[in-house]
């Protein structure tokens, strides 16, 4: 049986050798060039392949059509991936008749994603393992072929556990590969309800929070001990790294971060003390704890701290245009909850952000993006990340005012994008699920789904094509002029402060707000074309968390990416949404203040939106990019979102209005 292998690291070397020992023919091996900035303590797949006389390649993008064609020419019967760091395209996965199989360093479906070796130690697990699974489009989600458990000892650190996993992987492969070679490939579906996802870890994630339980701090030390970057803290401006530690249950009543003693060196945590066995000051040598205390000038009672502001990076400045809008005000709240963000915002009103106006890290100017261009250009230049959130985004306005939609949604935003290009600033741009239009795919894929819109005489599509054209312009600026960008596509986000009942009164609101207005005023709920259109409703808290992670941009994984942000599990028709809303309304404590329910009324879209409207039957996102780039998964049920949104609007109605 002929195999093509994708491999890197020690696990890659083990996998290559196991495949050879099982009698497979290896047509080629694909690996990575070592990164000079990375501590390459591990074995070299390229050197192993060269020594074995096997062709080896390290392309920058193995999914490029040129490489896909070359792999196809190799005619592999089977494909293996052993710790190869990039996802393989479906085109590659489908080249091998027997399938493509990946070795993952956890007991799937737990700990999907990045760095499972480190995460299991961070989380204090007592067991992990290795899993060989069939590769599918979603990372680490395919059927399980075989797995092997590995016990985690209390004294295990990252390197010792790494060696255990390599041994377990070799045993697993030695056992299963001969069976697979004969065509007998077990397949057990993963239980999605048990799946957990973890993202890439960065060196800065090793910063110790002494207010955590001592077991948490000790587990962090274990998880990132050498040759990983290490857990670290500060004494004043002096950084030091802890390479090994042990737990002492008694903190003697000391405050977290306080030095209890220097010989041995013990530091108080939330519920105990950490004894530092070995460590390193700055870029110095590794020494035992008491010598480290001497080097740092520590004495009993000293307080360790987070990096001082003078020695750390300045706060990240985020410019939000349209800051008073639904996404803008919720995002502002999330950013201000983090110490290292400063928010600059502009909008034509401030009712939704009034709670932030006195915040020292929030800077607001009331203005119009079509008028205050000088202020905008200055602040694009001044800030680090730009979010142009201003848009007309309600369907009835697409048919009422198509030219205004184009002028604001495309022309004004294009000017802002050009400022970002001019000053080389990162832009996080709100595309929209509307760009998919009448796409017929079961779920909409950012990188593969076609964007399909209706005829020119249906102005309903002006919003979709304005956004799509900006997406394409931004992409081109990224390709040709190095613009750093991320496009995010929200799918029907809902929650408090979505818009207003007054907007619903003039027909310029989202669907749920219009439905709530009908309940508040005792008018029939209008179901456009019967309300059979399906959407995937997403809680604003889930959406904002994903957007926040895009801004954080861990490992620059979001650069140049398009990311759907929606909840595929919350798919419902507008009729089902209305029924759920009515049920929540009837159970609400304020129900008695409002008129009786006036029933449902089916209306044609033409009579409601005008002749220029055209609807979409379904709109369901693929969120593989969000899982992969953000380590994000939506978690809030649709009923919870509906109840919170309803509660917000009902409590916003004043007493006199309720009585009337």
UniProtKB/Swiss-Prot annotation:
Residues 1-304 are annotated as: Formyltransferase ArnAFT. NAD(+) binds at residues 347, 368-369. The record marks 140 as: Raises pKa of active site His. One of its GO terms (molecular function) is carboxy-lyase activity. It catalyses: UDP-alpha-D-glucuronate + NAD(+) = UDP-beta-L-threo-pentopyranos-4-ulose + CO2 + NADH; UDP-4-amino-4-deoxy-beta-L-arabinose + (6R)-10-formyltetrahydrofolate = UDP-4-deoxy-4-formamido-beta-L-arabinose + (6S)-5,6,7,8-tetrahydrofolate + H(+). UDP-alpha-D-glucuronate binds at residues 393, 398, 432-433, 460, 492, 526-535, 613. (6R)-10-formyltetrahydrofolate binds at residues 114, 136-140. Pfam families: Epimerase, Formyl_trans_C, Formyl_trans_N. CDD domains: Arna_FMT_C (cd08702), Arna_like_SDR_e (cd05257). Residues 314-660 are annotated as: Dehydrogenase ArnADH. The record marks 102 as: Transition state stabilizer. Pathway: Nucleotide-sugar biosynthesis; UDP-4-deoxy-4-formamido-beta-L-arabinose biosynthesis; UDP-4-deoxy-4-formamido-beta-L-arabinose from UDP-alpha-D-glucuronate: step 1/3; Nucleotide-sugar biosynthesis; UDP-4-deoxy-4-formamido-beta-L-arabinose biosynthesis; UDP-4-deoxy-4-formamido-beta-L-arabinose from UDP-alpha-D-glucuronate: step 3/3; Bacterial outer membrane biogenesis; lipopolysaccharide biosynthesis. GO terms for biological process: lipid A biosynthetic process; lipopolysaccharide biosynthetic process; response to antibiotic. It comes from the Bacteria. GO terms for cellular component: membrane. Its EC number is 2.1.2.13, 1.1.1.305. Bifunctional enzyme that catalyzes the oxidative decarboxylation of UDP-glucuronic acid (UDP-GlcUA) to UDP-4-keto-arabinose (UDP-Ara4O) and the addition of a formyl group to UDP-4-amino-4-deoxy-L-arabinose (UDP-L-Ara4N) to form UDP-L-4-formamido-arabinose (UDP-L-Ara4FN). The modified arabinose is attached to lipid A and is required for resistance to polymyxin and cationic antimicrobial peptides. In the N-terminal section; belongs to the Fmt family. UDP-L-Ara4N formyltransferase subfamily. HAMAP family: ArnA. Homohexamer, formed by a dimer of trimers. This is Bifunctional polymyxin resistance protein ArnA. The gene is arnA.
């Amino acid at each position: 049986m002929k195999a093509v292998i994708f491999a890197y690291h020690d696990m890659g070397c083990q996998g290559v050798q196991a495949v050879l020992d099982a009698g497979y023919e290896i047509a080629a091996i694909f690996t990575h060039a070592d990164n000079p900035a990375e501590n390459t303590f591990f074995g070299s797949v390229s050197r192993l392949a060269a020594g074995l006389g096997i062709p080896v390649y390290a392309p920058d993008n193995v999914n490029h059509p040129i490489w896909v064609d070359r792999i196809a020419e190799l005619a592999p019967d089977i494909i293996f991936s052993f710790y190869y760091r990039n996802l393989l395209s479906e085109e590659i996965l489908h080249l091998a008749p027997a399938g493509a199989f990946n070795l993952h360093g956890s007991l799937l479906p737990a700990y999907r994603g990045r760095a499972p070796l480190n995460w299991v130690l961070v989380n204090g697990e007592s067991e992990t393992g290795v899993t060989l699974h069939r590769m599918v489009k979603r990372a680490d989600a395919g059927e399980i072929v075989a797995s092997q458990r590995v016990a985690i000892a209390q004294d295990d650190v990252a390197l010792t556990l790494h060696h255990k996993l390599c041994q377990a992987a070799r045993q697993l492969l030695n056992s299963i590969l001969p069976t697979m070679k004969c065509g007998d490939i077990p397949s057990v579906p993963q239980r999605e309800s048990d799946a957990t996802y973890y993202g890439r870890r960065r060196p800065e994630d090793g910063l110790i929070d002494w207010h955590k339980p001592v077991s948490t701090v000790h587990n962090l030390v274990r998880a990132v001990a050498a040759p990983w970057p290490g857990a670290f803290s500060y004494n004043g401006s002096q950084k030091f790294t802890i390479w090994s530690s042990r737990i002492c249950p008694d903190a003697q009543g000391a405050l977290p971060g306080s030095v209890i003693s220097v010989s041995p060196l013990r530091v108080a945590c939330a519920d105990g003390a950490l004894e530092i066995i070995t460590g390193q000051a700055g870029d110095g040598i590794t020494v035992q704890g008491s010598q480290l205390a001497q080097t740092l000038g520590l004495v009993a009672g000293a307080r360790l701290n987070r990096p001082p502001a003078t020695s750390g990076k300045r706060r990240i400045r985020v410019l939000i245009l349209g800051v008073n809008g639904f996404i803008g005000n919720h995002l502002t709240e999330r950013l201000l909850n983090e110490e290292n963000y400063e928010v600059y915002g502009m909008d034509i009103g401030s009712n939704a952000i009034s709670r932030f106006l006195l915040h020292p890290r929030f800077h607001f100017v009331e203005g119009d993006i079509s008028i205050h261009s000088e202020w905008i250009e200055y602040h694009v230049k001044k800030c680090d990340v730009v979010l142009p959130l201003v848009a007309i985004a309600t369907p009835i306005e697409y048919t009422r005012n198509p030219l205004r939609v184009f002028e604001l949604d495309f022309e004004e935003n294009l000017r802002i994008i050009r400022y970002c290009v001019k000053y080389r600033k990162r832009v996080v741009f709100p595309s929209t699920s509307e760009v998919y239009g009448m796409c017929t795919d079961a779920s909409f894929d950012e990188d593969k789904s076609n964007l399909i819109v209706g005829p020119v005489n249906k102005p309903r599509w002006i919003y979709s094509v304005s956004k799509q054209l900006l997406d394409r312009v931004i992409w081109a600026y990224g390709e040709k002029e190095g613009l750093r960008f991320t496009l995010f596509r929200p799918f029907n986000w809902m929650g408090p402060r979505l818009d207003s009942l007054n907007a619903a009164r003039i027909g310029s609101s989202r669907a749920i707000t219009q439905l709530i207005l009908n309940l508040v005023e005792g008018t029939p709920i209008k179901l456009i074309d019967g309300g059979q259109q399906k959407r995937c409703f997403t809680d604003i808290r889930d959406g904002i968390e994903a957007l926040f992670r895009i801004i954080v941009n861990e490992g620059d994984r979001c650069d140049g990416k398009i990311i759907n942000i929606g909840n595929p599990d919350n798919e419902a028709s507008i009729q089902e949404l209305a029924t759920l809303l009515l049920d929540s309304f009837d159970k609400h404590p304020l129900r008695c203040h409002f008129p009786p329910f006036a029933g449902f009324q089916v209306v044609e879209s033409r009579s409601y939106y005008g002749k220029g409207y055209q609807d979409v039957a379904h709109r369901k996102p693929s969120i593989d990019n969000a899982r992969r780039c953000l380590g994000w998964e939506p978690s809030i049920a649709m009923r919870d979102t509906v109840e919170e949104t309803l509660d917000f609007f009902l409590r916003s109605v004043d007493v006199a209005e309720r009585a009337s």
